[in-house]
Regions:
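Jelly-roll (double-stranded beta-helix
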Residues: 1-239
Length: 239
């Protein structure tokens, strides 16, 4: 088993880098925008993992994306989406949105509330096909969620509500305190990045707390042990 980042020799436990833009408070796991760390470029096909907090009524105006799979997971509040292929939607916790940007798409993202902050994770995955037709979908994943399990809601095939143009599996769940769960990797040449949304867990002899992460590869399975009630996101990707 290897743990840590594929491109560095840093300690395995990865913390996020904070940036405050007033209306946007964001925490970057990997190099993004004004944050650059040559040791934190990507974890295999996982290129971006941003933890954003957007003030009421604020957001990102129309801007382009190309040849990237973009997954947005709202944690609190209302995420308002619009794009250049005529999609308009508002999604809330328990739902996700997936954009396959392909040969190009413009989109906007706003806090759909004028009163409360929006908290969301935005994740970019490098696709295994480029210049495809752009697509947008949103999905209700709440029926999949079962207490004390990591439920898989994105995969490369039709076994889950959502899929990506990549060998990528997204799983998430809320686990009770003092609980153990085993995560089994889907393929020999993938790695899994665990992101602790809330709580305190032990993974591969590392203690991880809220918004910490760790990447693991060269193993078939990993045990997650919780020290308190915890919400965990697992992103398994091609290396």
């Amino acid at each position: 088993m290897h743990k840590g980042e594929l491109t560095n020799v840093n300690p395995p436990r990865i913390t996020t880098e904070p940036f405050n833009h007033g209306w946007l408070k964001t925490y970057h796991t990997f190099s993004f925008a004004n944050y650059y760390n040559p040791r934190r470029i990507h974890f295999g096909a996982l290129r971006v993992l941003n933890d954003d907090r957007i003030s009421p009524g604020e957001g990102f105006d129309m801007h382009p994306h190309k040849n990237m799979e973009v997954v947005s997971i709202p944690l609190k509040g209302y995420l308002k989406h619009g794009d250049s292929i005529e999609n308009q939607s508002i999604i809330t916790p328990g739902e996700i949105q997936v954009m396959s940007t392909g040969k190009g798409i413009y989109h906007s993202e706003y806090n759909g509330s004028n009163e409360k902050d929006l908290e969301l994770l935005q994740i970019w995955i490098i696709p295994n096909k480029e210049e495809t037709e752009p697509e947008y979908h949103n999905y209700n994943i709440l029926p999949l969620m079962k207490h004390n399990e990591l439920a898989t809601f994105i995969s490369p095939n039709g076994n889950t509500p959502a899929h990506l143009l990549q060998d990528a599996w997204f799983s998430m769940g809320t686990l009770s305190a003092n609980h153990k769960v085993s995560y089994h990797l889907h393929k020999p040449h993938t790695g899994v990045y665990f992101f602790i949304i809330e709580g305190n867990v032990d993974i591969a002899d590392e203690n991880l707390t809220r918004r910490d992460g760790i990447g693991i590869w060269d193993t078939e399975s990993i045990i997650i042990k919780t020290n308190e009630e915890s919400q965990v996101l697992a992103i398994e990707v091609a290396l």
